[in-house]
Regions:
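Structured, solvent-exposed acidic/aromatic patches
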Residues: 1-131, 143-149, 153, 172-174, ...
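Alpha-helical junction/boundary sensor with strong preference for TPR arrays
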Residues: 34-36, 161-164, 183
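Expand to "…catalyze enediolate/carbanion chemistry for C-C bond making/breaking, isomerization
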Residues: 169
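A contiguous binding-surface segment within folded domains or other stable secondary-structure elements
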Residues: 149, 155, 159, 163
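Active-site-proximal region of nucleotide-activated glycan assembly enzymes
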Residues: 138
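Long, intrinsically disordered, low-complexity segments
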Residues: 172-272
């Protein structure tokens, strides 16, 4: 069951999403007074995957591994975007070893952050771990212009992830940018990215939005062969960054609230 520390971490995340930087910092501080156990990746066992039941960073995990192997029956085979792979120091960042290559084509990097195919015990759907507390506190401090505190917790996390890490001190928007990049590196495939992108877009102090391109492979159901790929684009600040209201809620509402807008879109052509 969830511990006090797990509840504190989740609460600090909620305050972060609310842009309540003061309470996000207070809650993360309380958590890290209780538990500061970052897993130093220099001591990692190459025979073990990072997120396992032996990882001391994990505070709470719940749910199955359906995202892990439910679609293909294989081990952790979600393709990793090139932009994410390139964020890591290719020589010194231990997290780079989260990603392997497709054994048949070597074309795509695949995520290998979770356990092997032999009955994993840490969920890739819902996990709370200490590293997020460091990032939550660093971000809250940076938003309150406590640059010294923000740099301290960013440095502590990076020292446990990067060989021979030498910290550069950041301030202002550049510091927030570095923390956001570190959050993407550290928490990839743990269910954070979509929520982070949406809250960045409405951040009052340092707003950020980006274009997202998604590829959908279409298969021939009769031959079980790939047919073609459709590319869809979500533009910066697109209304679709906000989910539509469920039909059941709209039908129940007596005031007939308006549906959230959603632009119609078609896949890009081959020349786009």
């Amino acid at each position: 069951r969830a511990s006090k520390e797990a509840a504190q971490l989740l609460l600090s995340r909620v305050y972060l999403y609310m842009q309540d930087w003061h309470n996000a910092a207070l809650t993360a501080e309380e958590l890290l007074k209780e538990d500061t156990r970052l897993y130093h990746m220099s001591a990692r066992d190459s025979a073990r995957i990072f997120l396992s039941e032996d990882n001391t960073e994990v505070l709470f995990s719940q749910g199955s591994m359906n995202f892990y192997n439910g679609m293909t029956g294989n081990r952790g085979d979600f393709a990793v975007s090139d932009s994410l792979v390139q964020l890591y120091d290719q020589e010194n960042d231990y997290r780079r070893y989260f990603f392997g290559k497709n054994q048949s084509t070597s074309a795509n990097s695949l995520q290998w952050k979770y356990d092997t195919i032999a009955v994993p015990h840490v969920s890739d759907i819902y996990t709370l771990r200490i590293a997020e507390g460091y990032l939550n506190l660093a971000e809250a401090y940076a938003m309150e212009d406590n640059f010294q505190g923000a740099n301290q917790y960013l440095r502590l996390l990076r020292e446990s992830r990067i060989r021979n890490y030498v910290h550069t001190t950041y301030t202002g928007e550049k510091l927030v940018e570095e923390i956001r990049l570190e959050r993407r590196r550290e928490l990839c495939f743990e269910g954070h990215r979509w929520f982070d992108l949406r809250r960045y877009a409405v951040c009052e102090k340092y707003p950020y939005s980006k274009q997202i391109r998604h590829a959908f492979n279409v298969y021939d159901g009769n031959k079980y062969e790939w047919d073609h790929t459709d590319i869809y684009v979500l533009e910066k600040n697109d209304p679709a960054y906000v989910m539509q209201i469920p039909k059941s809620v709209l039908e129940y509402d007596e005031e007939q609230m308006p549906e959230n807008p959603r632009n119609k879109r078609s896949p890009l052509g081959d020349d786009e």
